[in-house]
Amino acid sequence: MDIIYISTPHNTHIQYLRKALAAGKHVLCEKSITLNSEELAEAIKLAEENHVKLAEAMTIFHMPIYRKLSEIVASGKLGPLKVIQMNFGSYKEYDMTNRFFNRNLAGGALLDIGVYALSFVRWFMTSQPTEMVSQVKLAPTGVDEQAGILLTNREGEMATV
């Protein structure tokens, strides 16, 4: 076995990443690769120490529409981007037993689909955001049910999600 694909619920990723990377296996892990930056730093360090590759599976970048958008932006036909707006959503019937509404199972809109929207705008921004402001609406279980995010960078680009 050369590579391990992790597609379990988000809250279990780090435990499987630790085992796979420590065993010297390359890993492709579904989004969100980890729950926070500390876990991600740990996973990256393990990959480096064991000389293996670690990658996050993000389907949107392989969809034809995203590839076409990338081509158009890269061509310069639109000029420099100043504002990027991304709306991404899904409807889930509220059910406090569903993993999407369960804090212990890393539920919430941002970890489930918000990563797609944030990855999209980051793909097109020239540099890392220097400022990020957000507002969320919490479900009764405490997970984020809705979110709005504003990102800006040193080039003056702005993105809304």
Task: List the model feature ranges, each with a label.
Residues 3, 15, 42, 64, ...:
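Alpha-helical elements of Rossmann-like donor-binding domains used by nucleotide-donor carbohydrate transfer enzymes
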Residues 119-161:
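Contiguous beta-strand/loop segments that form the cofactor/metal-binding neighborhood of enzyme cores
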Residues 23-25, 50-53, 156-158:
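A short helix->loop->beta-strand "cap" motif at the edges of active sites that frequently abuts
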Residues 9, 32, 39, 58-61, ...:
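Structured beta->alpha junctions
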Residues 41-59, 80-84:
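Rossmann-fold dehydrogenase core element
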